[in-house]
Each structure stands twice: as structure tokens, then as C-alpha cells.
């Protein structure tokens, strides 16, 4: 059965808007099922559950999706699992119970949604994955992600132009595909050069309020370090807050990824080494 043009067009617009937000480094993986869109011209409901709403990146993505949805007279239901896989599963089930016509998901866990995505797939509900992938891509209609590996590579290359040696602290979020790839890209780039050493790894869920005390605790260990490589800008903000509180921000190189306005301002002020930019507006427009 062919997709009716009405809702198929909305899905296309969502997907295009999201991908446009990513900028030049995005991939759209289309595994489109021919019977996935309801044959109806009635208003539709789109459900969205992000990894966390405590990140301006996702709030901007949601704003762009909302614009597209409203333009077509449809409804957007946005939920925040607050980094909890259990909550995200409950939210996806809730959205199915609300009979949504499509789902936009930023997964909390790379592998944790397998069984539920299979259920969604069997219900013929299109799924758009945004920003970070899931392992079970066969149940997904569209994946819109930036080149997370290359983002880590770019951070490493910038660091290597500024420092000929460094002791490095990693703030990571290993259970998400995007977080894993960003750190892997960074580490792979420095791997062959013994002048760059990773001396500490800390899981922070990409959250400022987790990264800050983790960084504070590490500072109290008294170890010498030069660079803090962070999987995203919120964790970089947490690291810088801890460094600033200990009068250690000067001379330290803090890297982030996302290109949030706050991070860009920190870079301009010389407080942050760099942030690799993504465009959440593009993500949102393509998902919309």
C-alpha cells in the first residue's frame, strides 16, 4: 500500500528539517516501510521523547519540529525521560496508547529499546531517530545523525595543533552511540602518538550537573592534566565550572561538541578551547 501524500509529506518535511539542522555532517538512513503511514487526512499526532530536555540542543530540535507540525494542523506530544531508559520505555508505550501516527526518538540507550521498537514497528508507526543511533536500525524509518566520530576527530586535531603533548581527561557517556563515537574518534586520532595520554575516564551522562562534581572530585586527586575532552557542551560546561571554582580554568583546554550558544560564547571569551558545531535547527526541520 502506498503512503498517502498528505501524511507522507509531513514525515518528509519533518525528516528534511531535522537533517538540515545537522549542517554538513549528517546522515539520513531511510529504511522506509511501504505500509507505515495511515491512509487518513485527519489531523495527526506526533510523539517525541528525547534523551533529556536538560540540554538546549534538544529544546531547539523540538521547536523546529513543532513549527512543521503546527503548519500542517497536527499535534506534537513532547516528553522528557530525563536520561532514564525505564522512563523512555514508559513514554514510548504511553505515546502508542495515545495512538500517535509517528514517533521522534533520541534514545537514552543504544541497545535498550530493541523490544519496544519491534512492537512499534509491528504497529506500523514510523520512527525517526534523531542525533544518536539505535542498534536495531531495521525497526527505524529514518535516522538523522551527524558524523559523531568525525566530531571527536576534529577536537583531537585542534588539540594537536595547540599542544605537542598532553595529559587528557575524558568525560564520556558510553551507553549512547553518539557519545561513544565522539570519544572514539578523539582517541583513535591520538592513539599512535605517545605524547598524548588519557589519564582519566569519567561517565557523566552528558549532563552538567553530573560532570561538575565528577570533575571536582578528580581535581581533588591532585593529578596533573592539560585537556578535558567532553562528549558534549553541557558536560564541558560542568567541567569548566569545576575548574573555575578551583581557579584552574586558565591554561586548561576544554573541548565540547554541539556548538551551543553558551559554548560558542565561552570559546570567544577564551575560556574554552573549542566546540564542534551541530545545528539543532536543522535536526528539527528534517525530523519535521
What do the PLM-derived regions correspond to, one by one?
Residues 110-150, 161, 260-268, 272-273:
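Flexible loop/hinge segments that line or gate small-molecule binding clefts
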Residues 65, 153-196, 200-201:
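An alpha-beta-alpha
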Residues 248-288:
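Flexible loop/turn connectors
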Residues 144-166, 210-212, 260-263, 279-288:
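Hydrophobic alpha-helical segments within soluble ligand-binding/sensing domains
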Residues 107-121, 186, 205-265:
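Hydrophobic alpha-helical
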Residues 45-64, 68, 72, 77-89, ...:
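Extracytoplasmic "Venus flytrap"
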Residues 10-25:
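Hydrophobic membrane-insertion alpha-helices, especially the h-region
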Residues 77-99, 201-222, 236-237:
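Structural motif
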Amino acid at each position: 500500500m502506498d503512503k498517502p501524500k498528505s501524511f507522507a509529506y509531513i514525515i518528509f518535511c519533518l525528516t528534511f528539517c531535522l537533517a538540515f539542522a545537522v549542517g554538513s555532517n549528517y546522515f539520513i538512513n531511510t529504511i522506509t516501510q511501504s505500509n507505515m503511514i495511515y491512509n487518513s487526512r485527519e489531523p495527526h499526532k506526533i510523539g517525541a521523547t528525547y534523551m533529556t530536555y536538560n540540554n538546549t540542543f534538544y529544546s531547539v530540535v523540538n521547536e523546529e519540529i513543532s513549527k512543521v507540525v503546527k503548519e500542517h494542523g497536527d499535534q506534537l506530544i513532547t516528553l522528557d525521560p530525563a536520561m532514564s531508559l525505564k522512563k523512555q520505555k514508559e513514554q514510548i508505550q504511553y505515546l502508542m496508547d495515545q495512538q500517535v501516527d509517528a514517533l521522534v526518538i533520541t534514545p537514552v540507550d543504544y541497545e535498550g529499546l530493541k523490544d519496544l521498537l519491534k512492537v512499534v514497528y509491528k504497529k506500523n508507526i514510523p520512527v525517526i531517530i534523531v542525533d544518536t543511533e539505535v542498534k536495531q536500525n531495521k525497526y527505524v524509518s529514518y535516522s538523522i545523525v551527524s558524523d559523531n566520530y568525525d566530531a571527536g576527530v576534529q577536537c583531537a586535531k585542534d588539540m594537536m595543533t595547540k599542544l605537542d603533548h598532553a595529559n587528557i581527561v575524558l568525560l564520556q557517556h558510553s551507553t549512547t552511540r553518539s557519545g561513544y563515537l565522539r570519544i572514539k574518534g578523539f582517541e583513535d586520532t591520538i592513539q599512535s602518538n605517545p605524547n598524548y595520554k588519557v589519564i582519566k575516564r569519567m561517565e557523566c551522562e552528558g549532563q552538567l550537573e553530573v560532570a561538575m562534581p565528577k570533575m571536582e572530585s578528580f581535581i581533588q586527586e591532585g593529578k596533573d592534566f592539560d585537556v578535558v575532552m567532553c562528549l558534549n557542551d553541557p558536560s564541558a560546561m560542568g567541567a569548566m565550572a569545576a575548574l573555575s571554582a578551583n581557579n584552574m580554568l586558565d591554561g586548561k583546554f576544554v573541548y565540547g561538541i554541539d556548538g551551543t550558544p553558551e559554548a560558542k560564547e565561552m570559546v570567544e571569551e577564551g575560556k574554552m578551547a573549542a566546540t564542534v558545531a551541530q545545528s539543532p535547527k536543522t535536526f528539527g526541520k528534517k525530523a519535521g
